[in-house]
């Protein structure tokens, strides 16, 4: 989420969110502004999620799933160490296949 969007974001209702982010992303730095963790927390709070599952897909990739939100909404966050602004795929070592993850997420809603 860009700094402009962050400063002007005023959602009218809860919205499911999927965030895939490389720690070493220099195009959209994880530290922001705003910090990606802050953005994810904002959406998790807005969606009134009550459960957080934290899973290491592989040692370098942590997946956080904020579940049981309003209207069944969820917030998913895949944080990939040693990864920049690239598309995670089966050919790399991230443990995340972006296309499949996106389909899995959005097919729920």
Which residue ranges define each predicted feature?
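Flexible, surface-exposed loop/gating regions in the mature catalytic domains
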Residues: 1-109
